[in-house]
Amino acid sequence: MTDLAAIKIVRLDKELPLPKRAHRGDAGVDLHATTDAVIAPGHREIVGTGIAIALPLGTVGLVHPRSGLAAREGLSIVNAPGTIDADYRGEIKVCLINLDPEKPIMITRGDRIAQLVIQKVELVDFEEVEELDDTVRGDQGYGSTGKTA
């Protein structure tokens, strides 16, 4: 028996392993590629993971790049982190990109291509107003915190 919350999962590709953590305290579980792919430098490819999940309302799945692949190969995720909404029930797919300027990246079926992190999320409604409360920062945006008086 485990004290971790259970997420319902459908294995769409029975030959691939279920997502799992490498270590008990890891935030993310590994996602595996359903197909082989060659991603040319600067190009992207949408790759299936062979799973669909049912997230509880008030949670979100975030698909992150794997740090080792990013560092060694230049493999990343175009929209990192990818967002899996609680009401989505289709296959989780990952839009991979090759950031290496010269070398293609080979993806082999079964490779661990991304990590899925499940988080609680605050669901809110928006209230339209004419103006916002004043703050010390105000409307100072990009680069404003690096300025000195």
Curated annotation (Swiss-Prot):
EC number: 3.6.1.23
Pathway named in the protein's UniProt entry: Pyrimidine metabolism; dUMP biosynthesis; dUMP from dCTP (dUTP route): step 2/2
Protein name: Deoxyuridine 5'-triphosphate nucleotidohydrolase
Signal among keywords: no
Keywords: Hydrolase, Magnesium, Metal-binding, Nucleotide metabolism
Database matches in SUPFAM superfamilies: dUTPase-like (SSF51283)
Native source species: Corynebacterium glutamicum (strain ATCC 13032 / DSM 20300 / JCM 1318 / BCRC 11384 / CCUG 27702 / LMG 3730 / NBRC 12168 / NCIMB 10025 / NRRL B-2784 / 534)
Similarity section: Belongs to the dUTPase family.
Molecular-function GO term, any one: magnesium ion binding
Binding positions for substrate per the UniProt entry: 66-68, 79, 83-85, 93
Catalytic activity: dUTP + H2O = dUMP + diphosphate + H(+)
Disulfide cysteine pairs (residue numbers): none
Domain of life: Bacteria
Enzyme class: hydrolase
Cofactor: Mg(2+)
GO terms (BP aspect): dUMP biosynthetic process; dUTP catabolic process
Lineage per the UniProt record: Bacteria, Bacillati, Actinomycetota, Actinomycetes, Mycobacteriales
Purpose: This enzyme is involved in nucleotide metabolism: it produces dUMP, the immediate precursor of thymidine nucleotides and it decreases the intracellular concentration of dUTP so that uracil cannot be incorporated into DNA.
Pfam families according to UniProt: dUTPase (PF00692)
